[in-house]
């Protein structure tokens, strides 16, 4: 690293006093010296009389520039380094004023619509359908693959990424912001990396790894929901097709094969190297980003747009761990959906009877926590056995998109069944980044976890076409049902016998000589007729 001049150091010091530790990904208009100095990211929408004349579309009533509201409630004890990470209080360590959009308007400059709305005035309801990839027509499958490849090669039209930490963000001369362009798909990868990266504590110190703003906590589902929604919106704009939707991969097959790993879809296994994708697939040409973990952790650098090696994938190939050689079963999903509490203390990867922890895959599908278990989402990732099984790299494998759309479908079904019951989503004391009102890192404009805790068809503009498996009974439940049935049968027989005994007793009383002898003969004849029926019963 080059040493800046004394003047540059002074300049940087003044800026850092204001911003503390910051920098991630922001709108291109905000990656400027002026915006960084002022701490204001409120781009113009349609400036008619010079820069700053239409911040956030103010002239047309679309939005206004306001102070950022960041969650300040306490987080859990898992993160002991308060003040050392630029993601704390997101995004206030970078900008303290952003666009607040009115009504159904949205976007970094209020120039787009909220999810679920469209039209020039954002007053038209929009609903797209996410379907099973295997149910698409041949043309639809081809179009999806082509769209992914296009996103990999198309520069993101709005966002740039930081390539240096706050101390170096202005460059060696103190006057050159260190941001880079990045493709739409690699931006999708980068945001995931940034949410899971370790906290850099300084040169010569080991980076802190027990921090994750998008996994192992209540925000797992809400964070990944917005992550997918952002990619879907970016691809819709890229294709100029608001009806485009991300399909899903129903990984709950219980099989030891990957049914979407074919060359016409996500790529089959290479015949030349079992850890690579077949050269007949377009995805064999993809190169990964954010793989230089050692540099990030020891030098404090950030992932940049440089691409490295190929995607690695070997489904069911981890012979050292038989548990991850087979995908989850359909009944695992059915059982998971019966876990009624969204989350439970300590709101972490060891929570039990937590729907979130169950679908994330740290608990048994019934909700029971077991440190040896990897199920559902986690198991599907580990089954891929390669790039897709490494948290910081996993989105580089495009199967990530399909795996998480299905996980989101399970989440949305749970929200529907339980009326989006947020009572067990903690307001505070969740792992850092996971409180209900926390702005999810590093999305822009700021969006809270609670904003994604809603049913998608009614609030986010998409729905799923999916058939959910019915739950089968476990062996213990079958035994219980059999015992109850047997006891019920005994009870019925006993009740029937009691009734017959009482009936016979009543008949005997009726035979007593309450009348004259001539009527007794009638009774005897009556007995001869009806006694045979009693033996049948």
Curated annotation (Swiss-Prot):
**Which cofactors are named for this entry?**
Cu(2+); Zn(2+)
Q: What is this protein called?
A: 5,6-dihydroxyindole-2-carboxylic acid oxidase
- Tell me the disulfide pairings in this chain: 30-41, 42-65, 56-99, 101-110, 113-122, 258-261, 290-303
**What job does this protein perform?**
Plays a role in melanin biosynthesis. Catalyzes the oxidation of 5,6-dihydroxyindole-2-carboxylic acid (DHICA) into indole-5,6-quinone-2-carboxylic acid. May regulate or influence the type of melanin synthesized. Also to a lower extent, capable of hydroxylating tyrosine and producing melanin.
PROSITE patterns according to UniProt = TYROSINASE_1 (PS00497), TYROSINASE_2 (PS00498)
Q: Which residues form the signal peptide?
A: 1-24
Instruction: Cite the binding residues for Zn(2+) A.
Output: 192, 215, 224
Query: Glycosylation positions?
Result: 96, 104, 181, 304, 350, 385
Q: How is it modified after translation?
A: Glycosylated.
Mode of membrane association: Single-pass type I membrane protein
Q: Where does Zn(2+) B bind?
A: 377, 381, 404
Compartment annotation: Melanosome membrane
* Matching InterPro entries: Di-copper_centre_dom_sf, Tyrosinase/Hemocyanin, Tyrosinase_Cu-bd
A single GO BP:
melanosome organization
Q: Does the keyword Aminoacyl-tRNA synthetase apply?
A: no
Q: Write down the EC number.
A: 1.14.18.-
Molecular functions per Gene Ontology: metal ion binding; protein homodimerization activity; tyrosinase activity
Catalyzed reaction equations: 2 5,6-dihydroxyindole-2-carboxylate + O2 = 2 indole-5,6-quinone-2-carboxylate + 2 H2O
Q: Which residues lie on this side of the membrane: Cytoplasmic?
A: 502-537
């Amino acid at each position: 690293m080059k040493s800046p001049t004394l003047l540059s150091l002074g300049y940087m010091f003044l800026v850092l006093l204001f911003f503390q530790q910051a920098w991630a990904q922001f709108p291109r208009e905000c990656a400027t010296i002026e915006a960084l100095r002022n701490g204001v990211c409120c781009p113009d929408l349609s400036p008619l009389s010079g820069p700053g004349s239409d911040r956030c579309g103010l002239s047309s009533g679309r939005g206004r520039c306001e102070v950022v509201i960041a969650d300040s409630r306490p987080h859990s004890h898992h993160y002991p380094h308060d003040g050392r990470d630029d993601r704390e209080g997101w995004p206030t360590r970078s900008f303290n004023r952003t666009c607040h959009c009115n009504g159904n308007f949205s976007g970094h400059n209020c120039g787009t619509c909220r999810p679920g709305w469209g039209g020039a005035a954002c007053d038209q309801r929009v609903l797209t359908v996410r379907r099973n990839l295997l149910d698409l027509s041949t043309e639809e499958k081809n179009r999806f693959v082509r769209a992914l490849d296009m996103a990999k090669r198309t520069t993101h039209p709005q966002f740039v990424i930081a390539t240096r930490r706050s101390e170096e963000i202005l460059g060696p001369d103190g006057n050159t912001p260190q941001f880079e362009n990045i493709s739409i798909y690699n931006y999708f990868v980068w945001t995931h990396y940034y949410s899971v990266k370790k906290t850099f504590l300084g040169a010569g110190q080991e980076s802190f790894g027990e921090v994750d703003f998008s996994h192992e906590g209540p925000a797992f589902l809400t964070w990944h929901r917005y992550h997918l929604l952002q990619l879907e919106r970016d691809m819709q704009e890229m294709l100029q097709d608001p009806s485009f939707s991300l399909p899903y991969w129903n990984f709950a097959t219980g099989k030891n094969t990957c049914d979407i790993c074919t060359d016409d879809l996500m790529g089959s296994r290479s015949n030349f190297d079992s850890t690579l994708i077949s050269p007949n697939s377009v995805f064999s040409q993809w190169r990964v980003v954010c793989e230089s973990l050692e540099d990030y952790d020891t030098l404090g650098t950030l992932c940049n747009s440089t691409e490295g090696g190929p995607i690695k994938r070997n489904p069911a190939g981890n012979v050292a761990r038989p548990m991850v050689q087979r995908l989850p079963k359909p009944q695992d999903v059915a059982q998971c959906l019966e876990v009624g509490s969204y989350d439970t203390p300590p709101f972490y990867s060891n929570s039990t009877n937590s729907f979130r922890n169950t679908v994330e895959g740290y608990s048994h599908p019934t909700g029971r926590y077991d440190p040896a278990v990897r199920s559902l989402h986690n198991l599907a990732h580990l089954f891929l056995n390669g790039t897709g099984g490494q948290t910081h790299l996993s989105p580089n494998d495009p199967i990530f998109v399909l795996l998480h759309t299905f996980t989101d479908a399970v989440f949305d079904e749970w929200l529907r069944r339980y009326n989006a019951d947020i009572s067990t989503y903690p307001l505070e004391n969740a792992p850092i980044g996971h409180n209900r009102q926390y702005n999810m890192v590093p999305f822009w404009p700021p969006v809270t976890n609670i904003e994604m805790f809603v049913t998608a068809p009614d609030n986010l503009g998409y729905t799923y076409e999916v058939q959910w498996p019915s739950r089968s009974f476990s062996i213990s439940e079958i035994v219980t049902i059999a015992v109850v049935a047997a006891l019920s049968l005994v009870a019925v027989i006993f009740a029937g016998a009691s009734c017959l005994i009482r009936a016979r007793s009543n008949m005997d009383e009726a035979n007593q000589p309450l009348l004259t002898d001539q009527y007794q003969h009638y009774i005897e004849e009556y007995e001869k007729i009806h006694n045979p029926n009693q033996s049948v019963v």
